[in-house]
From Swiss-Prot:
The keyword Thylakoid does not apply. GO terms for cellular component: cytosol; glycine cleavage complex. Coiled coil: none annotated. GO terms for molecular function: aminomethyltransferase activity; transaminase activity. The keyword Transferase applies. Pfam families: GCV_T (PF01571), GCV_T_C (PF08669). This is Aminomethyltransferase. GO terms for biological process: glycine decarboxylation via glycine cleavage system. It catalyses: N(6)-[(R)-S(8)-aminomethyldihydrolipoyl]-L-lysyl-[protein] + (6S)-5,6,7,8-tetrahydrofolate = N(6)-[(R)-dihydrolipoyl]-L-lysyl-[protein] + (6R)-5,10-methylene-5,6,7,8-tetrahydrofolate + NH4(+). It comes from the Bacteria. The glycine cleavage system is composed of four proteins: P, T, L and H.
């Protein structure tokens, strides 16, 4: 039996097309994936992300433990509510998961992990926490709703209490605050402004309905994928996994090499990979007809005249730009043009940094 989120009946009420997503019954779309995509870029849409797992890490050694566990450094987080993104690596520097960590106090951090990696993540964290004065608590009683788009914050404000609106006023990106029963964070997976709201399951249906009543449109996994790809955001299991190091997944910016004496898990292996050189994740743009798809081979000739090959990790038609975009892992020697093999023909593509759309506009 597939797992169902607390909002399952709300999806059925809205005539969602449900699909299995890593063991969860989730909405693919509510009619038109393209319309859902545009509503997030132009107005406000919401996603049920209750399949993701909230984990609270508490105790006297919570900071020390997370500085060991994560490649990014939680010691950088000084202001309560501030969050950072980064990888949890294995000893070979493979990415076990990418996750967001919120600093709530010196003895309380909150991690949000991907649904596809939940069991693996929790097993790894439980193993690594041995010997630390730390308690790891999964919070299955919490649901999560992401409200995203240029009008998302204004429409959410109509639903929040006065206290909650005061709490989020002026909040910068990548912060979270507990106000009343809601944990409201300025994070997302779309490249738009908005909130990810963690809500007790008992209140989730009422919050979803209140957002609906205020003109926020429900959006499914289909639009979520095209939006995150336009924003150049990785999808775990597709753009990276344990066989991929973070430098080859456009996550180099999330690795805190300083201070040198912080021995995070995977550091030694990653330093060796960095010294030897590794592949990189790039963006591809194809203005010709056709759609770039996962797995298609990518070819280019390097500066020495040698043909090199990589592969697309995520590809789609971009509803915002009107042509196809992709992310691809390729040898580091790639220039600004390449070719993709589709239907036994090679088609030219532009190579850019993997970010295509930000705040509704072309980002390259």
């Amino acid at each position: 039996m597939a797992n169902k989120t607390v909002l399952f009946n709300k999806h059925l009420e809205a005539n969602a097309k449900m699909v299995d997503f890593h063991g969860w019954d989730m909405p693919l779309n509510y009619g038109s994936q393209i319309e859902e995509h545009h509503v997030v870029r132009q107005d406000a849409g919401m996603f049920d992300v209750s399949h993701m797992t909230v984990v609270d890490v508490t105790g006297a050694e919570a900071c020390d433990f997370l500085r060991k566990l994560l490649a990014n450094d939680v010691a950088k987080l000084k202001v309560p509510g501030k969050a950072l993104y980064g990888g949890m690596l294995d000893h070979n520097a493979g990415v076990i998961d990418d996750l967001i960590t919120y600093y709530l106090s010196d003895t309380h951090y909150r991690i949000v992990v991907n649904s596809a990696t939940r069991e693996k993540d929790l097993a790894w964290i439980t193993e690594q926490v041995k010997g630390y004065d730390v308690t790891v608590t999964e919070r299955p009683e919490l649901a999560m709703i992401a409200v995203q788009g240029p009008n998302a914050k204004a429409k959410a404000a109509a639903v929040f209490t006065d206290e909650q609106n005061a709490a989020v006023e002026g909040m910068k990106p990548f912060f979270g605050v507990q106000s009343g029963s809601l944990f409201i964070a300025t994070t997302g997976y779309t490249g738009e402004a908005g909130y990810e709201i963690i809500v007790p399951e008992a209140e989730a249906e009422a919050l979803w309905q209140a957002l609906l009543d205020n003109g926020v449109k429900p959006c499914g996994l289909g639009a979520r994928d095209t939006l995150r790809l336009e924003a150049g955001m990785n999808l775990y299991g597709q753009d990276m996994d344990e066989s991929v190091n973070p430098l080859a997944a456009n996550m180099g910016w999330t690795i805190a090499w300083e201070p040198e004496d912080r021995d995070f898990i995977g550091r030694e292996a990653l330093a060796a990979i960095k010294a030897a050189g590794t592949d990189k994740l790039v963006g591809l743009v194809m203005e010709a007809k056709g759609v770039l798809r996962t797995g298609m081979p990518v070819f280019f000739t390097d500066a020495d005249g040698v043909e090199q090959q990589g592969a697309i990790t995520s590809g789609t038609f971009s509803p915002t730009l009107g042509y196809s975009i992709a992310m691809a892992r390729v040898p580091n020697s790639v220039g600004d043009v390449a070719e993709v093999e589709m239907r036994k023909k090679r088609v030219p593509v532009k190579v850019i940094a993997p970010s295509f759309v930000r705040n509704g506009k072309q980002a390259f």
